[in-house]
C-alpha cells in the first residue's frame, strides 16, 4: 500500500500538542467512502524489550464475509513515551511501516484506539486517517473522555458519548452481556456509518474481526 508519508514527529509533549491542535480542524467527520466496500482492515500495537521496540500489525479482511486476505507486521524502535492522549505519536510510525507492506488497499481502517473522542479531537484513528487520507474508525476498549448514560445489555445498544457538550462518539454494546466499546469517527466517515461497520464486523466476539485479528498478531511473542 502506497501513500505520501510527510509528517514531523515531536520530541516533547508541547510539540505534540501544537501538532494535534493544528491537525484537528482538518479531520472530516462526514462520509467520503470509496464504494463498494470490499476490504476492511484493523491495526493494533504491541511492544517488545520493555517497550523499546514497537510492533505494529495490520489485518486486511474481505467485506462483508470477513475472510483474512492479508496481514503484515512491522518493528521499529519506540521513540515517544507512553502518555495517554498522545499514543498516536508513539504508535503511528510503526503502523505506517506495516501499512506499506500490504498489497491490498482497504476501504476502511478500524483502529484500536480513539478517533475524535479525544481531549484535542485527534486520537490515533483521526491522526492516522489524516496522514494517509483514508476513512478510519476509532474502536477503543476504554473511555478517554466524555460521559454517557447506562446502556442496555443487548448487542447493538448504544448511548452517546458526550464531551464538552458535544457528541464525540458512542458507547456501543458489540456483543450481548459484554463490556461496551467506545466508537468514534476517525477521518472521512460519519458516526452512524462508523457504528454500522463496527457492528457488521463483529459477528461473534466483542472486538471487530479486523482489530481482533490484528490484536492477536501484535500480541504474539
UniProtKB/Swiss-Prot annotation:
Q: What is this protein called?
A: Endonuclease V
Q: Where does the chain bind Mg(2+)?
A: 44, 112
Asked if the Swiss-Prot or TrEMBL record annotates the protein with the keyword Magnesium, the reply is: yes
Q: Which GO terms describe its biological process?
A: DNA repair
Question: Organism, per UniProt?
Answer: Nostoc punctiforme (strain ATCC 29133 / PCC 73102)
What protein family does this chain belong to? Belongs to the endonuclease V family.
Give the required cofactors.
Mg(2+)
A GO CC term assigned to this protein in UniProt: cytoplasm
Q: What is its main location?
A: cytoplasm
KW Magnesium (keyword) present: yes
The GO molecular function terms of this record are: deoxyribonuclease V activity; magnesium ion binding; RNA endonuclease activity, producing 5'-phosphomonoesters; single-stranded RNA binding
Question: Organism's domain of life?
Answer: Bacteria
| Site residues by UniProt (Interaction with target DNA) | 82
Q: What does this protein do?
A: DNA repair enzyme involved in the repair of deaminated bases. Selectively cleaves double-stranded DNA at the second phosphodiester bond 3' to a deoxyinosine leaving behind the intact lesion on the nicked DNA.
